């Protein structure tokens, strides 16, 4: 699926602000980055659940730090809300940093996000 104009703009701002330290992957399945370990049913269930969940943007730094960035407009559908919760859960289990922004202004104004990027550079 091609990116919408808003997403392309978001990607552009992400790229200008964090490249060359990170690779940015738009519209990518989280499972491609996340391989939850463990044989217990809960983990298997999680993998099944997350197989087809696409994160809006996944950033990956050279030292393999991964953060999932999800961008929804003001009104997220029920399905999007559920998707967000699943992504958050996967991130929590796999020590991926998760950020959610309504728009690029929101992102650039996020102290946590900027701090995360700065910490990662040190």
Regions found by a protein language model. Give the residues of each.
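Active-site metal-binding core of divalent-cation-utilizing nuclease and nuclease-like domains
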Residues: 26-63
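Arginine/glycine-rich "motif VI" loop of SF2 helicases in the C-terminal RecA-like domain
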Residues: 62-64, 89-97
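Short histidine/acidic/glycine/proline-rich micro-motifs that form metal-
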Residues: 1, 74-78, 104-105
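N-terminal topogenic membrane-targeting module
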Residues: 1-40
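Basic, glycine-rich
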Residues: 95-122
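Active-site-adjacent loop/helix micro-motif of nuclease/hydrolase catalytic cores
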Residues: 50, 77-84, 109
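Short, well-structured secondary-structure segments
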Residues: 23-29, 68-69, 97-100
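Conserved catalytic cores of phosphodiester-cleaving nucleases, focusing on short active-site segments
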Residues: 14, 55-59, 68-74, 91
